[in-house]
């Protein structure tokens, strides 16, 4: 058996020698490269936290000590060390999640993979333990960009206010912009600054100086300033101590012995401690280290030797279509600028940034700031395009409502990964946007069905300068173009049964192919259908109620929550127009969806042509029976 195969839980790490730990780290990296290459996933971040994860589990007693991971995509090594080594179905249906999962293990605490939240969690858990007199440590691991999020600093401010509440923060600093201060001096200072004697000497010195008549206070302030200046010169993270946190580091994040020693000393300290570990994203895998873009942050199925993708390509992605079109628009209009929140490449703005470096801003993990800054840009005479993942726009709802919409700012939001994303699980599905945003006055929402519509609707959106607009599209490759056969108002008619159609299928965006297939199945049963793409789903097209009145049933199909979504808006529009036609809503139920392929998730929740056609057919049959009963 390999060294890794002998690790069934954290306790198995305790007896390993320094040489064996080094061997284990090499095995883990080799395992990760080959396992993640088979399934896809977050490779670079996990290659960077191998030694850090081992040191944590040697120094602490999980699950009694609670180890919390921010941006949980860096928890693969943690999974391996806590008895989860079957990565054969990582991020696949029935397999391990790509993030921590309480269902998988008692060692996992936070399932949410939205960044910058772990310090708030840690603050609450530490308070709960203090109030209830429970033993054990709370350890929060934050990094991979998560400290760019404002929530992290709000939490730090609160954590620092409790000088007597033990809490250990581990900063996994894998940013290449930091200058490493590694070696004997840093390790010596790390040892010194967490000892009780160091604290006692500081307290004694302060007391003596402040008691000295006339010059005592001035002398203390001068010496304190000198100490701070020296500290900041060698460790620029002195701002942490200015908050009131005990700062330790920087420490070599690949030196297990140094980290374990720092962790054990931190356990003895009686207040909040921040340990700064310098790690290398993609460590041990040359292709990742050579990849300047993001050090193989996320990879698809690939050959681990050549790094060539093995999954078949089904054509251009929605992201690439957007990325190319926004560049063309930027060439035509100098007032169009772009903003993203730590997602420049994933949302397709990298080409825009290369072409117009002075017209794009990556604000870090700060969606709220992105929205407000966009409002300022719009007020200043520009048209900002804010591109983020759909699930992350949830964070900026108040700013979109009160800063963008209230001020009627011409801002275009582009939501990538909208609807069911699949393998990344519950917190990455973009299934709430069309429900949450229904209440925003003046906002217009577009859901393009194909690449041609994405290009057209993006241009329509940036032409609006007195209200916010929004486009949404999924993660998958773009399918073939779906032509319109007719137009009603602003809607595209995709299919029309020639004689007295009974069912009006309202296809929201990428659900158009599903609706066309459902219509084909229904017509095989003698039920004629009309299929329309509303294009702009908010506000509801004023022509829709009149078209609905020509049918016996309206069915709205959307890859969004059924609660308060497009179907609910259509039902309200028909009610307001006094059109007495029932509306069936097909969408995502009110539940968090387990990770699986997008097609598997859609099948599980009934968003397939067969399921939709069957339920519509059954509903019409029931309606006919009820009508007959009334006549009798």
UniProtKB/Swiss-Prot annotation:
Keywords: Isoprene biosynthesis, Magnesium, Metal-binding, Thiamine biosynthesis, Thiamine pyrophosphate, Transferase. SMART domains: Transket_pyr. GO terms for molecular function: 1-deoxy-D-xylulose-5-phosphate synthase activity; magnesium ion binding; thiamine pyrophosphate binding. Transmembrane segments: none annotated. It catalyses: D-glyceraldehyde 3-phosphate + pyruvate + H(+) = 1-deoxy-D-xylulose 5-phosphate + CO2. It holds the Pfam family Transketolase_C. Thiamine diphosphate binds at residues 73, 113-115, 145-146, 174, 285, 367. Pathway: Metabolic intermediate biosynthesis; 1-deoxy-D-xylulose 5-phosphate biosynthesis; 1-deoxy-D-xylulose 5-phosphate from D-glyceraldehyde 3-phosphate and pyruvate: step 1/1. Binds 1 Mg(2+) ion per subunit. Its EC number is 2.2.1.7. Coiled coil: none annotated. Belongs to the transketolase family. DXPS subfamily. Homodimer. Catalyzes the acyloin condensation reaction between C atoms 2 and 3 of pyruvate and glyceraldehyde 3-phosphate to yield 1-deoxy-D-xylulose-5-phosphate (DXP). This is 1-deoxy-D-xylulose-5-phosphate synthase 1.
